[in-house]
Amino acid sequence: MTAVLQANALEVTAGQRVSRCIGPPAHPYAWVFRPGRLNGTHFLTPAVLDMQVGVLERARGERVQAHTHVQQSRKLNSSSELLYVERGRVLVDIYDEDWQLLADELLSRGEMLLLLRGGHALTVIDDARVIEVRQGPYSGVDKCFRDGG
């Protein structure tokens, strides 16, 4: 695994999968994940984040042992979102808490974006299907829109 620190972003390469951290690695705004091959199970995000992204690359016939996850109380300070582009292309603008644009990421089929803090906007470039995973429960009132819209 190699890491390259760039202006306001950290790129981590594990095998052929590249992830890019937007914002300071210790307190990121977002992680971008590009497709690639890995062997085994790899978590692409640091263990301290509120939401984890992992990849399981396994051969036919392999089995993950039956298991359960122990219930734990966790304190979360924000709601995280994962966007997975199943088809098409979307452009995601990523903002800090003061609505300053940090990055704009063009996502294509098979790519993911983990949004951890700050704001974001999405523009559909080509007809797309995007799967969104977020922490729940969702009350419907935990969004704050830029420009009051």
Residue ranges and their predicted role:
Residues M1-E57:
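A short, N-terminal "cap"/entry segment at the start of jelly-roll beta-barrel domains
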Residues D96-R117:
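Short acidic-glycine-tyrosine-enriched beta hairpin
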Residues V55-N77:
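Conserved short histidine dyad/triad with adjacent acidic residue
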